């Protein structure tokens, strides 16, 4: 339930929404505050079709302000029966021949949604990626570019701007074959185009090593205690001038924390889980090593334990 102002009660009260009638009713006096309202969110139920065709859901998705018609299109389905199949398929062909200026956007948005779902990203990131793609597409300058890389780069930038960054390698894993280099080039192109549009530098958000820590630790199956120690350590590492990328620092901290525990992880496994090369992890470890006594929590490891670590 939500709150709304009731003219009879003369104050805000809890209201109940009657889905069958479309009425919003005051829960205290029963006054209908709004009638015949339309729910624009997508339907939560789906009705399976045994014929193997698409599920015949009764309504489409929610309205989309990025599309010219708000996403409120009509699709001609195939009813049962041979004559019906012939009629509907003919109408369907004519419908497909009709001009739909949003067809390309719809396909792009579906691709972005699929990639985002595979990475477990929230709806706000999908919406931001859609918005970025629409702004670039409106400039009519992306023709001929790798579409998969472009969409993946939109998702990467959206993650950064929503303070939920993903590594390029993570984005690459769901990018339908686009390489890290192609996504990197597409990202630079998008940032340049958006900068030309607004006349300002595009805000990408700041990446911190801690942004990746919990996800990396989860990939390695680390215990809650080691995860906590890793998070505290990586946060403490920001106080020092360690000129390495946040992802490299996160990987090196995980290596150190696991070496101090009974659940030691091979460098190879950490490299696979984080996407950071083994050599890069070693170099980051070398930079962190002089500061370990101030970075590693005292409750997790004693000074003697730190001295037993391998010298870089």
Curated annotation (Swiss-Prot):
<comment type="similarity">
    <text>Belongs to the TFIIB family.</text>
</comment>
<dbReference type="InterPro" id="IPR013137">
    <property type="entry name" value="Znf_TFIIB"/>
</dbReference>
<dbReference type="InterPro" id="IPR013150">
    <property type="entry name" value="TFIIB_cyclin"/>
</dbReference>
<comment type="subunit">
    <text>Associates with TFIID-IIA (DA complex) to form TFIID-IIA-IIB (DAB-complex) which is then recognized by polymerase II.</text>
</comment>
<dbReference type="GO" id="GO:0008270">
    <property type="term" value="F:zinc ion binding"/>
</dbReference>
<dbReference type="GO" id="GO:0070897">
    <property type="term" value="P:transcription preinitiation complex assembly"/>
</dbReference>
<feature type="repeat" description="1">
    <location>
        <begin position="115"/>
        <end position="192"/>
    </location>
</feature>
<dbReference type="Pfam" id="PF08271">
    <property type="entry name" value="Zn_Ribbon_TF"/>
</dbReference>
<feature type="binding site">
    <location>
        <position position="9"/>
    </location>
    <ligand>
        <name>Zn(2+)</name>
    </ligand>
</feature>
<dbReference type="InterPro" id="IPR000812">
    <property type="entry name" value="TFIIB"/>
</dbReference>
<keyword id="KW-0805">Transcription regulation</keyword>
<dbReference type="Pfam" id="PF00382">
    <property type="entry name" value="TFIIB"/>
</dbReference>
<protein>
    <recommendedName>
        <fullName>Transcription initiation factor IIB-2</fullName>
    </recommendedName>
</protein>
<feature type="binding site">
    <location>
        <position position="6"/>
    </location>
    <ligand>
        <name>Zn(2+)</name>
    </ligand>
</feature>
<keyword id="KW-0862">Zinc</keyword>
<dbReference type="InterPro" id="IPR023486">
    <property type="entry name" value="TFIIB_CS"/>
</dbReference>
<keyword id="KW-0804">Transcription</keyword>
<comment type="function">
    <text>General factor that plays a major role in the activation of eukaryotic genes transcribed by RNA polymerase II.</text>
</comment>
<feature type="repeat" description="2">
    <location>
        <begin position="216"/>
        <end position="290"/>
    </location>
</feature>
<keyword id="KW-0863">Zinc-finger</keyword>
<keyword id="KW-0539">Nucleus</keyword>
<dbReference type="GO" id="GO:0005737">
    <property type="term" value="C:cytoplasm"/>
</dbReference>
<feature type="binding site">
    <location>
        <position position="26"/>
    </location>
    <ligand>
        <name>Zn(2+)</name>
    </ligand>
</feature>
<dbReference type="InterPro" id="IPR036915">
    <property type="entry name" value="Cyclin-like_sf"/>
</dbReference>
<keyword id="KW-0677">Repeat</keyword>
<keyword id="KW-0479">Metal-binding</keyword>
<dbReference type="InterPro" id="IPR013763">
    <property type="entry name" value="Cyclin-like_dom"/>
</dbReference>
<dbReference type="GO" id="GO:0017025">
    <property type="term" value="F:TBP-class protein binding"/>
</dbReference>
<feature type="binding site">
    <location>
        <position position="29"/>
    </location>
    <ligand>
        <name>Zn(2+)</name>
    </ligand>
</feature>
<feature type="zinc finger region" description="TFIIB-type">
    <location>
        <begin position="2"/>
        <end position="34"/>
    </location>
</feature>
<dbReference type="GO" id="GO:0005634">
    <property type="term" value="C:nucleus"/>
</dbReference>
